[in-house]
């Protein structure tokens, strides 16, 4: 991640929203450069670390919270749960998300694991920790990203517009008190990982429930359909 001003790294609205943690973002950039200098790689690639913040802040209607990026090289792309279009096989969590997507909405299985269309339509795909060491899950937890992503979530909640947050798993559920501070509805279920998907993620209908909550608030529903 290059050392550049925040407004050159993220969308204009996000640059304003993240201004309180601009110094922390800079410190995390320095942390990543030190990692590289000492021979330790990180994921996703530098230009994708802040990718979730390159879509318009004012257009976010839905927040889907992940934990940290996929640790498998070639998988992480800076949007929670998403992968590059050419990734095969899909990560198991994403495969389970697509199983629920087809059951909930009746759409066919998507042709790839690229969730960029959701991000372009107002769904923020945010990991609480934005980087990871390859092959080592959770390796960058507690390094400083949490302050940045917490600021981002608080900024979304503080807007004078409705938000629906999708909380998959116990880690994401800890955000519920923060989300309760504003006009934010929440949808909770177990995580889509193979360890927990059968304990309540399957059958939870998150996509149609999000749209029901948006429409109840007079907000345009999300077009979830993927190519």
Curated annotation (Swiss-Prot):
What are the GO BP annotations of this UniProt entry?
Answer: base-excision repair, AP site formation via deaminated base removal
Any one GO MF annotation of this record: uracil DNA N-glycosylase activity
The catalytic residues are 68
Where is the major localization of this protein?
A: cytoplasm
Name the GO cellular-component terms: cytoplasm
**Keyword S-adenosyl-L-methionine: yes or no?**
no
Question: Mind listing the UniProt keywords for this protein, alphabetically?
Answer: Cytoplasm, DNA damage, DNA repair, Hydrolase
| Enzyme nomenclature, EC number | 3.2.2.27
Matching InterPro entries, A to Z?
Answer: UDG_fam1 (IPR002043), Ura-DNA_Glyclase_AS (IPR018085), Uracil-DNA_glycosylase-like (IPR005122), Uracil-DNA_glycosylase-like_sf (IPR036895)
Q: Enumerate the catalysed reactions.
A: Hydrolyzes single-stranded DNA or mismatched double-stranded DNA and polynucleotides, releasing free uracil
Per UniProt, subcellular location reads as:
Cytoplasm
Q: Does the keyword Iron-sulfur apply?
A: no
The enzyme's first-digit EC class, named in words, is hydrolase
Similarity comment: Belongs to the uracil-DNA glycosylase (UDG) superfamily. UNG family.
What does the UniProt function comment say about this protein?
Excises uracil residues from the DNA which can arise as a result of misincorporation of dUMP residues by DNA polymerase or due to deamination of cytosine.
- Tell me what this protein is called: Uracil-DNA glycosylase
Species per Swiss-Prot/TrEMBL record? Mycolicibacterium smegmatis (strain ATCC 700084 / mc(2)155) (Mycobacterium smegmatis)
């Amino acid at each position: 991640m290059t050392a550049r001003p925040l407004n050159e790294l993220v969308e204009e609205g996000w640059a304003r929203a993240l201004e309180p943690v601009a110094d922390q973002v800079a410190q995390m950039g320095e942390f990543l450069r030190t990692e590289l200098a000492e021979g330790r790689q990180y994921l996703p690639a530098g230009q994708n670390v802040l990718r979730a913040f390159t879509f318009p802040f004012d257009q976010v209607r839905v927040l889907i919270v992940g934990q940290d990026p996929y640790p498998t090289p070639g998988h992480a792309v800076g949007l929670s749960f998403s992968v590059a279009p050419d990734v095969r096989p899909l990560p198991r969590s994403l495969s389970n998300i697509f199983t629920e997507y087809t059951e909930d909405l009746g759409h066919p299985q998507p042709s790839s694991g690229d969730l960029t269309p959701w991000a372009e339509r107002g769904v923020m795909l945010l990991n609480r920790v934005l980087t990871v060491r390859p092959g080592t899950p959770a390796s960058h937890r507690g390094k400083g990203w949490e302050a940045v992503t917490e600021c981002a979530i608080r900024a979304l909640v503080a807007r004078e517009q409705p938000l629906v947050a999708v909380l998959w798993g116990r880690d994401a559920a800890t955000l519920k008190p923060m989300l309760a501070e504003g006009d934010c509805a929440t949808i909770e279920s177990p995580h889509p990982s193979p360890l927990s998907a059968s304990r309540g993620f399957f059958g939870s209908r998150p996509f149609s429930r999000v749209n029901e909550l948006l429409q109840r608030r007079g907000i345009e529903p999300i077009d979830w359909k993927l190519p």
